[in-house]
Amino acid sequence: MIAVAGPTVRCAEYATYGTHELAVNAAKAMAGRKAVILANHGILAGAKDLLNAFNIIEEVEYCSEIYVKAKSIGDPVLLSEQEMKKMAEKFKSYGQKKSIRRETEEARG
């Protein structure tokens, strides 16, 4: 999820749908993030375009489903903020192939 939606997604405090209070709660919880879960309502995502917003929503929903399933058999291990930062850094080069020369140099130490 970190590569798509960022390291954290907050849940906004509940408020009645269509109210200014709900909008304020959503904005507060979403500050600095790409998505927010609205308690008892659903999810909002912000992105540069609609396709990216849908990708964020799909990723958050998928991770939420995994979390609920994991909770059904015990307490899942949650990653610390430090570990999440480490993962974010690793994702910057995730899937990129190293050159043979670089691999050889790294193997030699």
Model-predicted segments: where are they?
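Glycine-rich flexible loops
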Residues: M1-G109
